[in-house]
Amino acid sequence: MSGKLTIITGPMYSGKTTELLSFVEIYKLGKKKVAVFKPKIDSRYHSTMIVSHSGNGVEAHVIERPEEIRKYIEEDTRGVFIDEVQFFSPGLFEVVKDLLDRGIDVFCAGLDLTHKQNPFETTALLLSLADTVIKKKAVCHRCGEYNATLTLKVAGGEEEIDVGGQEKYIAVCRDCYNTLKKRV
C-alpha cells in the first residue's frame, strides 16, 4: 500500500510545526517507527530539534540536502516528518515520491509563500503531490483578527530566503499586508 502525503502550510505563527509535532506524537503513541528531519539552515530555536514557537519539540536529523533523508529510513519506518520544507531544494519532491511508493506516510510543514507573496518552489511541488493539505491561519499582528494568511517581513532586507522569527516577520491578513506594504 502506498504512503500518504500530508502538507501543513500557511504563514508564520500559524501553528504548522505544532501540528506536525502532534502527528509525530500520534505515530509514536501507535508504536510506529518515525524519522524526523529539519534543514540545517534553520537553527532558530535549537540546532538538533524541531521546536515550535510555543516551545514544544522533538529530536530531528539535521540535513542540508533532501537526498540525505534516505540514509535514515529503515525497513520498519512508517512515518517521515519534515519541517520547514521551503528551505529544501526541489529535489525533496523526488525523495518524497520514493517514500510514498515504499508505503511510508510523509508529513511536511512549511511556508507556502514568501514575504513577497511568491510561492516557495519546493512547497508548491509538494502541494501538487499531497493527499491532504492543512492550510493554517494565524492571528493578524496588526488588526488582531484570526485571518492572517500572509507573512510580512518587517526587518532585515528584501531577501526571500532569510531565516528569522518575530524580529523579522509578522503574520498579517491580506488587507493589513497591503496597508503595511504601502508604508515600506
UniProtKB/Swiss-Prot annotation:
Main subcellular localisation: cytoplasm
GO biological process: DNA biosynthetic process; thymidine metabolic process
Subcellular location: Cytoplasm
Catalysis: reaction(s): thymidine + ATP = dTMP + ADP + H(+)
Cystine pairings recorded for this chain: none
Cross-referenced InterPro entries: P-loop_NTPase (IPR027417), Thymidine_kinase (IPR001267), Thymidine_kinase_CS (IPR020633)
Origin: domain of life: Bacteria
Residue positions binding Zn(2+): 140, 143, 173, 176
Record Pfam families: TK
Group of enzyme by EC: transferase
UniProt xrefs under NCBIfam families: PRK04296.1-1
Protein family (similarity comment): Belongs to the thymidine kinase family.
Protein name: Thymidine kinase
Gene designation: tdk
